[in-house]
C-alpha cells in the first residue's frame, strides 16, 4: 500500500507520512520544517505516500487536527508488519528519531519575511 516512487527503507531515517486525502496531518509547511529539522540534526529523512488507488489508514493526529487546528506532521520509522506481534524496524532509525526529537526540542521555529528559520533555544 505504498507509492513505488516514494518507497521507504529500514535504517533510512525518519519517515514523513503524507496523503493527498489528508489522512495524515502533514502539509507542505510542516513537511518543509521537518526536513529542515532533519538536516539540522544530521538525520536522513524519507517521505511515504500511500498508493494513489489504495486508501491507507489514518492517524489520531488527523482526527484531532480536525477539532483543533495545530500545525503538525506525521512522522515515524519504516517498519514491516506494523501492529503485528512481531514488528520489525531498523535499529538506526530509533537513534535517528531520538536525535530528531532532541533537535526539535532544542530549536525555536521563527517565521521570517521569506519563510522560516531555525534558531537555538
Q: Where does each model-flagged region fall?
A:
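His/Asp/Glu-rich mid-to-C-terminal helical/loop segments that flank catalytic regions of hydrolases
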Residues: 77-121
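Active-site-adjacent substrate-binding region
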Residues: 2-84, 112
Amino acid at each position: 500500500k505504498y507509492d513505488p516512487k516514494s518507497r521507504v527503507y529500514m535504517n533510512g531515517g525518519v519517515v514523513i507520512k503524507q496523503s493527498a486525502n489528508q489522512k495524515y496531518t502533514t502539509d507542505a509547511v510542516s513537511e518543509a520544517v521537518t526536513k529542515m529539522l532533519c538536516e539540522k540534526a544530521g538525520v536522513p529523512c524519507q517521505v511515504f505516500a500511500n498508493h494513489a488507488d489504495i486508501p491507507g489508514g489514518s492517524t489520531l493526529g488527523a482526527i484531532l487536527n480536525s477539532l483543533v487546528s495545530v500545525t503538525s506532521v506525521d512522522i515515524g520509522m519504516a517498519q514491516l508488519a506494523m501492529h503485528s506481534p512481531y514488528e520489525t524496524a531498523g535499529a538506526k532509525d530509533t537513534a535517528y528519531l531520538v536525535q530528531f526529537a532532541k533537535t526539535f526540542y532544542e530549536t525555536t521555529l521563527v517565521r521570517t519575511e521569506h519563510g522560516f528559520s531555525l534558531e537555538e533555544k
